[in-house]
Amino acid sequence: KPSKGELYFNGNKEVLDSPRDSQNLGLEMVYQDLALAGNLPIGENIFLGREPTKNLGFLKILDYKKIKEMSEAHLDKLKIHVKSADQKVEELSGGQRQAIAIARATAFNSKLVIMDEPTAALAIKEVGKVLDLINGLKKIGVSVIIISHRMDDIFAVCDRVTALFQGTNFAEAE
């Protein structure tokens, strides 16, 4: 919950009591530390907490085939190239991991993705790929808010920039 003020999204006042409330509205977050499970495959990371299931009698079990198929389709849509959705995240480069975190945030009809320092820990070559991915999100109608100290990256992908200093808005540009 905000410590102060109100939250409006698409013109409606919203009260968010949990991360699930945010997700249900189409608001997602990509954290600076990525919050990926390195020991799990890419597909399972994308669906973590929202895994498709199938019925086995009275039990529900994870549908690994569907996880793989849906993950690969989503990665293709975003033009993210990996060997397989079965590949473990710990085997990926920093840029690929960032791409998987972005794929996870956009896999469920996201309307707005907030990214905290999406290029901070990446090599220059990988930065370009992540910026291309962010531009691709814009093309498919996903709004993106980027929190970053790398102004070159901001100017490369943002349509509007707001600079904050100690919580105060001190500059804006379009």
What are the residue ranges of the model-derived segments?
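Glycine-rich phosphate-binding loops of nucleotide-dependent enzymes
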Residues: 1-174
